[in-house]
Design a protein with these regions (language model features):
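Class I (Rossmann-like) S-adenosyl-L-methionine-dependent methyltransferase catalytic domain
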Residues: 1-28, 32, 37-88, 108-112, ...
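Short catalytic micro-motifs in class I SAM-dependent methyltransferases
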Residues: 100-101
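A short glycine-rich, Lys/Arg-flanked "PGG" loop and its adjoining helix->strand segment in the class I
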Residues: 111-123
Length: 191
């Protein structure tokens, strides 16, 4: 985890979060950053005036985010050290960000965790996140969750889907390991 945190601590916010923020019609409100890591997305949200609850199972990730948080934003940052499997109930939020995070929820607990996400998101709230597809190099690892296109679209049946893209490419992980990626990027508004 230390290598991942070092590799991502100065990275800019994910483009998917920036796209989602362009869909937000109101003043900044409460955001929940799931699997926040070193805080690249949390820090961007704080800089834009949001109140952020950053959740990660790793204490070092949360410590890194706390160190990087500007003094004038500390009162708007809450840190929660929990795994996805132990995160119920989630705090209410107007925006839930899950950049490259949800695949790390165990498959047997994903449905409950997704229900928790749906319940935590306010009406008209935005979800933005990534899901690994079944052709991802890590597919088959029993502790990770993967989706096919049909199953993923069913998760958002009653939502307004604002952005849905499927990507597949050969690249590297944040720590430089070669990997075949199969990824879905979703931005949706809760009805």
């Amino acid at each position: 985890m230390a290598d991942f945190l070092a590799a991502t601590r100065d990275a800019p916010a994910h483009p998917s979060l920036l796209r989602a923020l362009n869909c937000w019609p109101a003043e900044p409100a409460n955001a929940l950053d799931l699997g926040c890591g070193a805080g690249r997305d949390s820090l961007h949200l704080l800089a834009r005036g949001w109140h952020v609850t950053a959740l990660d199972r790793d204490a070092q990730a949360l410590s890194t985010l706390a160190l990087l948080c500007p003094d004038d934003a500390r009162a708007r940052l809450q840190l929660l050290q929990r795994s996805f499997e132990d995160a119920d109930p989630l705090p209410a939020a107007h925006l839930i960000n899950a950049s490259f995070a949800l695949p790390f929820c165990s498959p047997g607990r994903f449905a409950d965790f997704w229900r928790g996400i749906s319940n935590a998101l306010t009406a008209e709230g935005l979800f933005v996140g990534h899901f690994f597809g079944e052709r991802d190099a890590w597919a088959g690892q029993r502790l990770l969750t993967f989706h096919d296109r049909t199953a993923l679209l069913q998760l958002f049946d009653s939502w307004e889907t604002l952005h849905f893209e499927e990507h597949e490419w050969d690249g590297k992980t944040a720590v430089g390991q070669r990997k075949h990626w199969h990824l879905f990027e979703v931005i949706a508004r809760r009805s």
